[in-house]
Amino acid sequence: MHTKEEKMAAFSRLLDVQDRLRLQCPWDKKQTFESLRPNTIEETFELCDALMKRDYKDIKKELGDVLEHVMFYSIIGREDGEFDICDVCNQEADKLMFRHPFINWKEEGNWTVSNPDMYINDAGQVVYKETDEAETGKAEAANTEETRKAETANLEETLALGASKPKNAASVEKTWEQIKQQEKDGNERVLSGVP
């Protein structure tokens, strides 16, 4: 496949393309979190379809579309002075390292965490520093975990109910058409300057 350097160069190239589009493309200039949301939903559905078909060509294409949305939202976050793609990547890396305490992060390489409330202990585990902020962070992490478990249970229940009801192609197509219409309406509002 590709070397780490090639991957970094490709990511950097995509960042440059996305930044230029935001500056010079009339459609890209007008996009907001709200206007992009229907497109993100559609791209996510298309990725799921490709995954279900195990169509690697389409999976690669749809992953690119979803990645574009992650980068686009990060550009908007940067413009709002809140976060950028670096913050997104670092937060995700910190979260993954924290959620995998059985991995010794001191064993190979020079691993670090970007969150100032966290550090890698002598056992190689990512842990929170013992501060009031860290306690808040741990509480938020626990609340997030509980919320995620509850949402997963609700989703599983919903899917189980849906599985017991036969769905026909017409109802699926109708739902898909409604999503496409919402996207079209949102794009028309953005292009006309209506919020």
Regions found by a protein language model. Give the residues of each.
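Flexible "arm" and connector segments at domain edges
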Residues: 1-62, 68-195
